[in-house]
Amino acid sequence: MRFTRLRLNGFKSFVDPTDLVIHEGLTGVVGPNGCGKSNLLEALRWVMGENRPTAMRGAGMEDVIFAGAATRPARNFAEVALVLDNADRLAPAGFNDADTIEIVRRITRDAGSAYKANTKDVRARDIQMLFADASTGAHSPALVRQGQISELINAKPKARRRILEEAAGISGLYQRRHEAELRLAATEQNLARVEDVLDQLAQQLSTLARQAKQAARYREIGEELRRAEGSLLYRRWREADLARTEALAILRERMTAAGQAEAAARKAAGARAEAEATLPPKREEEAIAGAVLQRLTVERDTLAAEEDRARATIATLVSRVDQLGRDIEREAGLNRDAAETIGRLEWEREALETAHEGHEERLAEAAEAAREAGAALGEREEILSERTEDAARLSARHQSAQRMLVDSRTTLARSEAEAARARETVEAAAEAQERAAETWEEAAAAQEEAQERAEAAEEALVQADEARAEAQSREAEARAQRSAAEGEANALRAEVAALARLVDREAQAGSQLLDRIQVEPGFEAALGAALSDDLRAPEVAADAPSGWAALPDYDETAPLPAGAEPLAPHVGVPEVLRRRIGQIGLVGREAGAALQPLLQPGQRLVSIEGDLWRWDGFRAGAEDAPSAAALRLKQLNRLVALKRDLEEVAARAEGARQAHEALQARLAQLTRADQEAREARRAADARVTEASRAAARAEADRSISGGKLESARLAVKRYEDEAMEARARLREAEGVASALPDLEAARAGLEDLKMAVEAARIAMMSRRSLHDELRREGEARVKRRQEVTKDLSGWKHRLETAEKRSAELAERKAETEEALREAAEAPEEIAARREELAEAIEAAEERRARASDALASAEAALRAAQEAEREAERQAGESREARARAEARADAATEALQLAAERIREETERTPQQLLEALAVDPERIPTVEALETDVGRLKRQREALGAVNLRAEEDAQAVQTEHDTLKAEKTDLEEAVKKLRAGIQGLNREGRERLLTAFEQVNASFGTLFTHLFGGGEARLVMVESDDPLEAGLEIMCQPPGKKLSTLSLLSGGEQTLTALALIFAVFLANPAPICVLDEVDAPLDDANVTRFCDLLDEMTRRTETRFLIITHHAVTMARMDRLFGVTMAEQGVSQLVSVDLKRAEALVA
């Protein structure tokens, strides 16, 4: 399978439909930071089945949906499509029915993800297995994101094993083994459950036999129990009938006594009311005296608090003076310490300068010695290189001579055999050429017909796209209008509901008049000021104690003052308020005070703002808190206006909804038409592709057959010539092999020269180490001298600052001592004020005592009256309770009688008389309830002693036996399934080990070669560690760049680590090439020279594999080596766009 196209729609910053074409070779992606380049890699991983939100750099999977920008609304879905070329038909069986496979993943808010393969719904598991079998997938090492190279470098050996698994192509094998292990565990669990059930069924069979014997005894006890229970029911009914007769007689006596007690209670209540009338004046006097005393007491407590604050201030100032003295002493000590530190630092600076003298001369001498040792080493290495090349050439000549001998003999035998086969091929190729010419003519005609149909389908698709785009635009506008209208309607509904709840909560029981009044908007404050909380009273009858009673109109109504208009035309009130509302006039705020003296009794004036002027001289301004009645009237008017507005907005929202739904239906219809057109276009393209492929195959077959015929003729001549040449080369190789010098003597001389070179290298390294040590010592002294100079400057600055601080502390101490002298005068003033308050408090206490004595006498008289009332009420209450108990007893007796009769009907479906006839006994001879209950209890205990009795024991036993036999057969099947699953898992493990070891050898060999290519020398290899089982072992990387010792990957430099990791990734490609490789800014740590090596390696990979590379980069060298470039831009804030340039075509055009 080959990846050909990646399509994004609404995925992260790619809000518009965007296609990324993936051709053969190197495809580059460039653009500024933050413009969305890495979103392309994440889209590719997402469509291949990635389900971790963190891998998508999000908190939840819905974060991949475009979230909106300044000029773009948020999307409700995101979709990514991946087009695969399956012309080779290498896909799994479920996907291998077409030359092109289109994998689509779509996510919708609050609905989750859905996968489709060529428009058919599939599972995420199927998609993951499809890519796993193709040696790729969401977690493939071939998809290298930013930072993943570092993760590979820092990974533990077992984590690196996943790279080897990808090379072996066993990712899918691991998943299948895991599924088999899950099925094995489930099967073993089912087998255990079946064995448990079989044991339970065996126990049930033995239990059922015992239960059958209990059934007969159970029936006998049941008959006796039914007769005893019937007698008990009748006996209880008869006793309940006698108890009811007695209870009715007692009730009549209690009702007479209760009436007499209630009359005495009413008389005591009148006496208590007279005593209560004398209390209010005495309580008022006592409250006034208490308030005066309280005010004076508060003043005394305040004065005491002031005295405490004054004393606290004095103590604070004294403490502050002491603290400032200590601070001055501390600053003096710090000044002495700073002077000592400055002296010590100056001595150390002089010592460092003395030690540094002569350093440069010693360093130059060591450098010269290191250079001389290096020159000597270079001379010996040059000699070694020449001798090594001579020995290699001699070894190569020996090997070449031997290979020539073997190759000549092999070529002679092969050429003679191939010449004979080529003569046979000439005859078969001539016949095949005639058949291929006929097939090509038929395929060309079919291709022309399919092309005409594809052009017609393309035109229909263009028309459907235009219609759908227009409908989508109109639907978006209608959706916005509907959303706005519904939002306004919802806001009004919420306000109406809140205001309605507030109005309903304030409504009082008894139908207050306030709820029956209608006021013109703007006049609520005027009516509320005129009537205030009187409007909360209900309308009542003429004899009611409180409320609005209806009265006839006045015989003659006094007119309102000139300049005042009646308020009545602006309000609608019930009939009961006509007298009151007719006495209210409406005036301007400036005229009210002037007209108030002209008011007649009962009249009042109000302003529209809420001011009030009454006939008796009272007036209230609108700036006072408005009355509750005025607020409620405004709420009622506001509620009416809101409901009217809500009806209009709701009608408008309903119209917008209908229009939006109509456009939605139209858009759905056009979308279906567009989809059908796309399907038709896709089908036509598929037919064109199939016809083109058939024509191409026919043309290729014709060309191939012609070529085969010509090749076969040439092969006959070539193989005959090769046989003659092979005989001549064989004679020549035998002569060359006998004339070569001795190879072993040359190798021995070369080993001696290597030992001399190694001794020179050790001497050079020693001199270099001495030079480096001198240089480090000099740098350390310079650094310490700079630090000492810096510290010396700092301590001098501290000394100057400390002197200024000491002067400031002395000044603050003088100011604090002055404040202390002023604070010491306050306690004497407070003592004089305390004496004056003591005299006033003594007078107030005498007044309060007199008022309290008078109030106590009145309250004692009231308590006596209340005690008498309570006693009368107690007796009345006891009489009422006795009456209630008698009533309850009578009701209970009646209810008990009814319940007894009802229970008889429920349990026997008979009346009491019918039950007595059924029992056939004399009522007087029926035993007592206690005796019958004893018999019933005894029979129940006997029945309960039998326990649970299964009356269907024999039928149950047969059913259990049948189930037991069925489960035994199922147990045999499960045991067989467990054996098969275990054998399958063992087979998968065996296959995985074999494929993993094979891949290890291939990857290890390729890794060493690529490492040497990238570094220009050196060596590297892979090592399995931590386990003898390849499936559990870790993978360690051992490498030796040129001029360094063999070490692990973690000990290399950053650039070397990156090149080594890339060599490993590409070695995996050579073992099991993935269809696609994405490298996200892997060249960032590399310099220009290493980037050039990296690009050379990419070119080599494109030649040796069919992998298609997608390179995300910022490096100019990498960009220049790409076959084509895609640029990701963000001209519109938050929205990514894709532009492309084909560099190969551009070079061709320039040429």
Swiss-Prot record:
Belongs to the SMC family. Homodimer. Residues 421-483, 806-826, 862-889 are annotated as: Disordered. Its main location: cytoplasm. GO terms for cellular component: cytoplasm. One of its GO terms (biological process) is sister chromatid cohesion. ATP binds at P32, N33, G34, C35, G36, K37, S38, N39. Residues 421-438, 465-480, 866-889 have a biased composition (Basic and acidic residues). This is Chromosome partition protein Smc. The gene is smc. CDD domains: ABC_SMC_barmotin. PANTHER family: STRUCTURAL MAINTENANCE OF CHROMOSOMES PROTEIN 3. It holds the Pfam family SMC_N. Keywords: ATP-binding, Coiled coil, Cytoplasm, DNA-binding, Nucleotide-binding. It comes from Cereibacter sphaeroides (strain ATCC 17029 / ATH 2.4.9) (Rhodobacter sphaeroides). It is found in: Cytoplasm. Required for chromosome condensation and partitioning.
